[in-house]
């Protein structure tokens, strides 16, 4: 069975997902937005308590609220960041993005370890997430679609009750 655990993290109430195969314990983290230490503990605690093996750290896009926890995931689970290269410029100015919202970043963001492109497949046990490139909210926005469960993870491409924002840099 595909298990989907949702967390709301950081001052922006960003959604972070841990997607796992209950049989193999393999999982992916989508949009590690955990900013505060207690949020990081909640995320890693869930993964450790459920004996999950993190295979992927997937970013739907590289706006800061979706990536505050990338370094924590990398340091804790030794998994690099997977994101679309069209969003790489956002990593270069993440400190400036944060200061616009009165947020301090302790460390620079981790770089993209694996570039994701249209139709790339990410296997989690017997399940597959297919990458669909949907520029608009950001140039590198990605939806991860699981055909077997008919579910999509799209970051800020859609908001509840509206379309996602397209007025941000690169949108």
Regions of interest found by a model, annotated:
Residues 1-3, 100-104, 125-129:
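Short Pro/Gly-enriched beta-strand edge/turn motifs at strand-loop
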Residues 6, 18, 29, 90, ...:
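Conserved beta-strand positions that form and line the central face of beta-propeller blades
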Residues 7-9, 105, 111-113, 133-135:
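Short Gly/Pro-enriched turn/cap motifs at secondary-structure boundaries
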Residues 28-31, 56-59, 131-133:
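Short catalytic-loop micro-motif centered on adjacent basic/acidic residues
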Residues 34-123:
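Active-site HxH/HxHxD metal-binding segment of metal-dependent hydrolases
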């Amino acid at each position: 069975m595909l298990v989907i655990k949702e967390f709301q993290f950081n001052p922006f109430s960003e959604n972070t997902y841990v997607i796992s195969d209950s049989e193999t314990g393999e999982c992916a983290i989508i949009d590690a937005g955990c900013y505060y230490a207690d949020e990081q503990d909640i995320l890693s605690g869930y993964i450790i308590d459920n004996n999950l093996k993190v295979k992927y750290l997937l970013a739907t896009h590289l706006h800061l609220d979706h990536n505050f926890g990338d370094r924590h995931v990398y340091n804790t689970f030794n998994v690099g960041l997977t994101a679309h290269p069209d969003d790489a410029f956002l990593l270069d100015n993440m400190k400036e993005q944060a200061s616009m919202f009165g947020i301090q970043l302790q460390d620079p963001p981790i770089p993209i370890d694996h570039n994701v492109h249209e139709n790339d497949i990410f296997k989690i046990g017997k399940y597959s997430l297919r990458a669909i490139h949907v520029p608009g909210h950001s140039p590198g926005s990605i939806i991860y679609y699981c055909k077997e469960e008919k579910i999509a993870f799209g970051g800020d491409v859609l908001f509840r009750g509206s379309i996602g924002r397209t007025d941000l840099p690169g949108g």
